[in-house]
Structures are given as structure tokens and as C-alpha cells.
Amino acid sequence: MILKRFFRLSGLKIALLSILAVSVIYYLDPDFLSLLELKTLDLRFHSRGKIVTTGEVALVAIDEKSLDELGRWPWPRVRMAQLLDALVKYEAKVVGFDIVWAEPDENSELKSLSALKQKMNELKLTNRDLEKYLSQAIQKADTDRTLADSLARSRRAVLGYFFHFFTKEDLPKEKKQLPKDLPPLSTYNWVKYSSQAAAKVPLFEATYAEVNIPVIAEAAEGAGYFNIFPDRDGTVRWIPLVIKYQDKHYCALSLAVLQKFLNNSPLVLRLAEFGVEEIRLGDLFIPTNEEGRMLINYRGPQKTFPHYSATDVIHGRVPAKAFKGKIVLVGATAMGIYDIRVTPFDHVFPGLEVHANVIDTILKQQFLYRPNWVTLFDLLAIIVLGLILGIILPKVKALWGGLDRDFSFFRLRPDLQSIIPETRDLGEPDVSSIQSCPYLSDDHRLSIHD
């Protein structure tokens, strides 16, 4: 008799079992629910549509038109120097390159001249006029030096590079080291720890760096990595703002460019026991998750930011004030030579424009983030709603219960346009907490940070 009573289902028991089941699902975070959450976030982006940018960012694209007029990619370093010199004339405040020059430029003329000079030295042939001519010719033929000179003259260029994340077994035999004199803007100016344990928090840690050759790296004002890690469905929604390498903390290209744009404002990283607590760039606060990843508030589909063809810039066919006082990002967008990304707006999206969205989001301080209290709120919602559904609703007549649920659906579920007005930020809807009540609005996950 006691066993029968124990196993007899009641509203309270059903509620407790439901709460337990949903709590376990919430804790385990199964893939299908995570993917569903990500897709609902994408739907919210589409519903919100395009939003106004700061107008501080412009893109110079190495596109099909540029390749048709100036030749196939990769371009000689002299061509890139011409492009940078043109942007200086247009008075761009900062020029960021979504490009890495990791190897010396292939130059047959330079090799021939260097070989001739070496042969003269071996044969002990002396001719001052010939030696002077060869030295000048070698200097002129050294396209790496030509680009480096252009970078140094501009005093506004920030370079890109990237990290590899090999396992120890897959590391190359000769591990490339970051140059000791890598521009300091590549790292955080200050890293502050809340405790000794905070110094050991796991972050994205690279094992190999693909950096620019020294002659070019030393001439720039800074350098930032352009690594981007897509979500499990292949869509880019987040960007890592800090990567650890050889006991130093490096910043993304977007942050390095912004730092130069904001007159070298200090870049500060605060670490706590749980991970990244805070990132600040001068007076700008940048919310991230514990891994140091920022959720990108995409301004819209591709070409939301003004695009200009590199060949038009070189040939002076761009309006005079197109780049004045602005951040200019340079990178490839021609089919076959650029990194294709999938974003909530487009399945084909240039990686160059991802960096533009990150920069504009930070400048406008219009972030998408999940407050720390949301997890507690979700658990409380699971418990409260589970008890309501298991105890109160069974006591309500079926007719009135059905009407009440229908009414709650229309009352608590406004149309998507009202969920995401332009002045509000998007949060990540948590599907598992909604399971305990099919009609729960997810408005509580929207967070505003103005």
C-alpha cells in the first residue's frame, strides 16, 4: 500500500520529476539544444535587420576589379606600398591589414644582383662605381624594404598575423618563435589577476605563431592576430579577444587597430578564478565570456560598411574625404583568395568585414552579452514554472486552462520586431529553461548596455 502511494503520480511528483529532468538537461547542455539556441539567435538578427554604423570604418578590398587591373594575387610588396602611400594621402587615421607577410618576397632581380655582388667579393674584384651601383640597385630591388619604408613613414599601419593550435605531437620540428622586438601593441599593456589562482585560468593557448618577417614587423605601429573560431554549426558569432602564447597575452587585430585609433589608449585585461573578468580599452568596457570571447553584434549583411576597390584607391578614383580620419581595413575579397566566413546574415561573408563589425560594436558600445545572473534566473524559472505547471494548472478546468495558455502565448510572445528593437541588445535564448513552460517569453535574456 505504501509502495503504491509512493509510485502513484501526483501533480507535485510530476512537477518535481519535470524540474529534475529539465535541470539535468540544462546542466548537460546537449548539442541539439545548443544548436537550437544558436539558430534562434540568428533568427533574431534577421528580424532586427541592418542597423546604423558609427561611420568610422571603411574597407579597401583587393577584389576582382583590382586583380584584373593590377595583376594576380599575391601582389608584389611594391604594390602594397603604393596602396598604403595612397591611403596616407587620403588621410586615413589608421590602416589595418588583414594580411600576413610571413615569407620574403620572391624577387629574381634581387637574387641576381645579390649573387653578382657576392661573386665580386669572392673574386676580390674592386670597382667603387660598380659597387655603389650594385648597392643602390639591390636596395631598389628589395621590395620587402620598400614596403617596410612605407610602413615606417605612414606611422599608422597595424599588421595582421595568426596563431596555430597544434598539439605537441603535431608541432613542426623547428618551432617558429615570435620576434623579441614584436611591436608591443600586440600584447595587453596590463594583465591584472584577482588572485594567484587567476594566473592559471585556462585561456586559448597557441603553440605556433605565423608572424610577419622582421623587416616588415619592426616598421609597423602594431600587430594583432586575426584568428576566428566558428561555432559548432560553422557560423562565426564570437571572436576571441585574448590568446595566450609563451606566457604573454596577445590581442586581436580589431583591438590593436582600435588602440591605435584611440591614440594608444591602455589595453587592460583582468583575470579572475573563473576566467576573463573584464577587458578595457581606455574608457571603453568590452564584455566577454570567461574565455575572453566577445559576441559580435553584426551591423547587417555583407557590404554594410563602405567598400572601395584597391585599384581605385591606388589610381586616385575615390572621393577625397572617403577615408579622412577613419579606420581603414585592407584585405582580400576576390573569389578564391579570401577567407569565406558564415555569419548569421550570410553564408558567404568576407573575414575582413567580420573585423569591421567587431570594431564598430566596440566603438558604439552596443554589445550582445549574457549577464552572470542569467544562469541563476534560468534555474529559478525551471523550478517555479515546473511547480506552477505541476500543481496549479491541473486544478484549473481544462477549458479555462486551455484559454489561459492561449492567452499567455499571445500576451508573453510579442512579435520578433518588438523583441529586438534597434536600441536593445540580443541575448542568447536558453531553450532548456523554456522547456518547463512552452509559453515562456525569452525577453528576460535581452540585455542593454548603453
Feature roles, as predicted:
Residues I2-L284, A320-F410:
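Non-transmembrane functional regions of envelope-associated proteins
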Residues L403-D415, S432-C437:
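Small-residue-enriched core segments of transmembrane alpha-helices in multipass membrane transport
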Residues I434-D450:
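Juxtamembrane or sensor-core-proximal signal-transducing alpha helices
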Residues E353, V358, S432-Y439:
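C-terminal, active-site-flanking charged/polar segments
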Residues R413-E428:
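Transmembrane helix-loop junctions at the membrane interface of multipass transporters and ion channels
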